[in-house]
Amino acid sequence: MDQPTDLRGGGALPVTAPHPLDNAVTAPHPLDNAVWAALTGPHAHLAERLGRAARYPADVYAFAALADPADPAAWADLHALAGPGTTVRVKPVDDVPDGWEVVGAGRGVQLVDTALRAEPAPEAVRLGPADVPEILDLVARTRPGPFLARTVELGTYLGIRHHGRLVALAGERLRLPGWTEISAVCTDPEHRGRGLATRLVRAVAAGIRARGDVPFLHAAADNTPAIRLYRSLGFTLRRSSRIVVLRTPGTPAARTGVAPHDTLSEVAPDGSGTPWTEVTA
């Protein structure tokens, strides 16, 4: 079983108030099951839920979650929710029940803000539904991870434009009590090396902190350059976990089309299905 990393060893910073991680080692923490905490918390209005299993709509974020990955009843609920012969992404998962086929697997790391300099970026603009075609184009060229037609509904997304063209992006994905994930960090290859990604990460973090939340993020466990960048910005490695793409037991019912939840064929270590590539600040 994966365990959180104690962040306070080796010369801790002075503490004037309890930090959200104070009980991370001794008690279950929302970040240990972040997708479930989001779907049963601030993102409950987006959840497709059955008992102890839940998932996001297929065009929002292609992940499902279990209240307790060690609970057979939660797996039974996920099977009923997803249906037979369907592929689902789930994290974190250590052991998969008999009858569930592992289609793909990888490891990701979770990092939390402990010393990030958060500040607005005057050149950043807020992005909305009208900007989704441009966002999808940038994401397709830079491959920061999944971004779907309605992902923008998860939180605030900021972008930087050059001569009117979107060249950099970052925003909020998972939101759970006290915590918000920074995601979709990417920069057009022609505009890297200018610090655009760093400015957007700090700007998104400023908005997260303004409402009293702590920023966190995920990266592929083997993406050393990305992890190095995030740590240099003030994020601390908290934990590593396993992400899986599974096919549920049974034969799918006949249908005329293939639902987006059924189109997954592989999973990167960050759970995105594609490698996280933006590492240039």
What kind of feature is each model-predicted range?
Residues 2-32, 110, 114-145, 251, ...:
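Short amphipathic alpha-helix that is part of the acyltransferase structural core
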Residues 95-100, 198, 221-239:
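Conserved active-site alpha-helix within GNAT-family acetyltransferase domains
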Residues 1-96:
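N-terminal charged segments
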Residues 64-68, 185-192, 220:
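A short, internal acetyl-CoA/4′-phosphopantetheine-binding micro-motif in the GNAT/acyltransferase core
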Residues 101-113, 218, 236-250, 281:
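Conserved catalytic-core motifs of GNAT/GCN5-like acyltransferases
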Residues 146-156, 160-187:
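A conserved beta-strand-loop-helix scaffold within acyl/acetyltransferase catalytic domains
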Residues 73-78, 193-208, 227-232:
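Conserved acetyl-CoA-binding loop-helix of GNAT-fold acetyltransferases
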Residues 89-94, 207, 216-227, 243-250:
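Conserved beta-strand-loop-alpha-helix junction that forms the acyl-donor binding cleft
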